[in-house]
């Protein structure tokens, strides 16, 4: 029987492709793996007691999800701006994200020179920082009349995949830096604005939330891509 850590890695791989249109390129390669999860995964055969999913595969999946979420977040920003952006004054558009307290590299070049341990912590902290905002955003969009179905679908998908992604990144982190403790993540305090009876207040809250989500999703993908290239290969 494969060890618990291997089972968690295998379960995460299967979770990536369940219940979503995401990762069509990965579905075929993982279908047999997921169907056979009661037995040893294909890469565990003849390796009883010491099986691990290849690190390259873990990074491939994580970066694919992160890239997908980043693109979805960008699409959400564009769709929201097209529908509501003109009704928001320039002063309200000033963005102060709740994750601004997390000190991140100022550029990709600076990120490339940042230690692995720090990049892992940044990714995990950023992902956890969006647990509550995404939950409330999806709830409010679902309960609001006139919400674009496409906008709601994108928000739901990002929420689902962000949860899967953070699990996967933690699996990778434990493989590379076992025993490493992560930093506390910032608390989101904009729920009252997101649920306000004032339509303008709500629109500004969603505007800021979507723009911050896009910013952070891009950072997450960039950091994971750097880690992948540094620790495995950039070719896939």
UniProtKB/Swiss-Prot annotation:
Pfam families: Hormone_1. Coiled coil: none annotated. CDD domains: prolactin_like. Disulfide bonds join 44-51, 97-212, 229-234. It comes from the Eukaryota. InterPro entries: 4_helix_cytokine-like_core (IPR009079), Somatotropin/Prolactin (IPR001400), Somatotropin_CS (IPR018116). Residues 1-36 form the signal peptide. One of its GO terms (biological process) is female pregnancy. GO terms for molecular function: hormone activity; prolactin receptor binding. It is found in: Secreted. Keywords: Disulfide bond, Hormone, Secreted, Signal. SUPFAM superfamilies: 4-helical cytokines. GO terms for cellular component: extracellular space. Belongs to the somatotropin/prolactin family. PANTHER family: PROLACTIN, SOMATOTROPIN,PROLACTIN. This is Chorionic somatomammotropin hormone. It comes from Ovis aries. The lineage of its organism: Eukaryota, Metazoa, Chordata, Craniata, Vertebrata.
